[in-house]
């Protein structure tokens, strides 16, 4: 069994009871942290099998709007399909690039600025890559964004929402975090996907910066901005790794 399949099967054991949203292996320890366990966990955002690039993050964070969005039936259903990696033919696997959810706070962080714009959150980390991909392959911005949504995935070390991650000691104890690290080690060893670690690199287990064809690890001093601009090692590496967009991509 591949590491990707093992990770997906691990999360297939999660059951949505609608009250406490936690993987059964994490149930006791997760309650000790400052996690918002009424929200669905988000260990992976994107299609892990098809992704050509995987971006490592610490945890999904917490926004005041998250609660309202999870009451949106269409969005919650998309979250659950993503959690089980059972994406539909019309899904945008990296959900924050889905035009239907372009007012989600995650969309402003990863994709394009929302209206009204919120400066601290509207970092649009993948926007430069989308625009460069559209120019490189001669397709529309919409087609390029759809391609990135299928070929880039975000892997969280901790799958649970938290504003501050006050109990970082739990990152070395939660079974789901250990599974994420196990997956990371397999991805790095195989080199089949580009892995980009921009933030919390020490928590992921990296001792310092790395720059190879299949692994980019930022210096810890770059962790605050965690830029994926084309001038950054991570952004330029992702663009190089991405396959060409089909001309008729929607």
Model feature map: region roles:
Residues 1, 249-250:
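C-terminal end-of-chain micro-motif
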Residues 45, 107, 207, 222, ...:
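Feature targets compositionally biased, intrinsically disordered low-complexity regions
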Residues 212-248:
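Short, flexible loop segments at boundaries between secondary-structure elements
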Residues 55-59, 192-204:
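Glycine-rich anion-binding loop/nest that anchors nucleotide
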Residues 2-190:
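A polyanion-binding, active-site-adjacent surface
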Residues 156-158, 199, 218-223:
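Residues at the C-termini of beta-strands that transition into short coil/loop
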Residues 35, 174-179, 205-227:
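C-terminal/domain-terminus segments
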């Amino acid at each position: 069994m591949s590491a990707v399949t093992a990770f997906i099967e691990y999360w297939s054991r999660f059951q949505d009871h609608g009250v406490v949203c936690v993987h059964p292996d994490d149930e006791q320890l997760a309650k000790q942290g400052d996690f918002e366990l009424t929200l669905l966990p988000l260990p992976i955002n994107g299609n892990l099998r098809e992704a050509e690039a995987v971006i490592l993050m610490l945890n999904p964070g917490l926004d005041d709007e998250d609660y309202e969005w999870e009451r949106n039936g269409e969005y919650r259903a998309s979250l659950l399909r993503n959690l089980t990696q059972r994406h539909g033919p019309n899904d945008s696997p990296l959900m924050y690039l889905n035009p239907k959810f372009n007012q989600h706070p995650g969309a402003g962080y990863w994709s394009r600025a929302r209206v009204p714009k919120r400066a601290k959150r509207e970092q649009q980390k993948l926007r430069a890559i989308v625009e460069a991909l559209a120019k490189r392959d001669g397709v529309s911005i919409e087609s390029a964004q759809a391609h990135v949504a299928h070929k880039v995935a975000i892997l969280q070390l901790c799958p649970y929402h938290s504003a501050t991650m006050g109990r970082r000691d739990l990152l070395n104890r939660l079974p789901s975090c250990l599974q994420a690290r196990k997956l990371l080690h397999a991805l790095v060893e195989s080199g089949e996907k580009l892995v980009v670690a921009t933030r919390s690199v020490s928590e992921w287990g990296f001792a310092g910066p790395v720059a190879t064809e299949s692994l980019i690890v930022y210096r810890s001093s770059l962790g605050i901005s965690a830029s994926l601009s084309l001038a950054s090692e991570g952004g330029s590496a992702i663009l190089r790794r991405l396959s060409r967009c089909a001309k008729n991509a929607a």
